[in-house]
Amino acid sequence: IVVAPCSPFSVSRDLMREAAVLARQYGVSLHTHLAENVNDIAYSREKFGMTPAEYAEDLGWVGHDVWHAHCVQLDQHGIELFARTGTGVAHCPCSNMRLASGIAPVRKMRDHGVPVGLGVDGSASNDGASMIGEVRQALLLQRVGFGPDAMTAREALEIATLGGAKVLNRNDIGALAPGMVADFVAFDLGHVAYAGGHHDPLAALVFCTPTQVHTSVINGRVVVKDGQLATVDLPRVLERHNQLAHQLVSGA
């Protein structure tokens, strides 16, 4: 359970402050979108006389129980603030590219100790919603923005697993270890996409064409088996989904 106004710029200052109080009364986390693009920076400076990160601090929206999506335009002061307070960031590289928001300074964030996880930002700005595809994109985008040494395959995968767990303030997920929640996925390395990459399966998984998972287990429950969803009647769901999508775009 998370208290999550969409953006601090779409609701009142009082609502943001009261949301922070409410979340901490119930011991749940806070989430919103912040510093996504240059327009956010300009609006925040004009409206509040401060950067989005400074505004978040003023509202009580920093701390280990808070994570912000994007933070593409987070400046040095904002990075240091988030590192000092343990405020997390959900990096959404595909969304940032689709909306031309820019390249989030993930390398600098991590070097300063900011908790960084990985997100897809929902279907409105990411039609694929592939987490392994997002891992690949995070790595490539950091490299194109900050150089070939900006991120390794292992680090990109770490952001998506251990990084996400830290951002969510969870110590029971993100790794395979005794006492942890039984969350894991399995990929078929016999797939043609990974041909020639078996000497380094981790790099192959991140760099090669993203494939669907062979098996997915969430909290001990098998959700995907042999590449197929095991929890729903997928053909029926897809048929209904396509009907509703057609009605929506046609105005029927």
Residue ranges and their predicted role:
Residues 34, 93, 188-190:
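Nucleotide-sugar donor-binding loop of glycosyltransferases
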Residues 1-88, 100-116:
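Histidine/acidic residue-rich metal-binding segments in metalloenzymes
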Residues 158-252:
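Active-site microenvironment of metallo-dependent hydrolases
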Residues 58-65, 107-191, 206-210:
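His/Asp/Glu-enriched, well-ordered alpha-helical/loop segment
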Residues 76, 97-98, 126, 194:
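Short glycine-rich, flexible loops that bind phosphorylated cofactors or substrates
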Residues 36, 93-97, 122-124:
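Short, acidic/turn-prone active-site loops that include or flank metal/cofactor-
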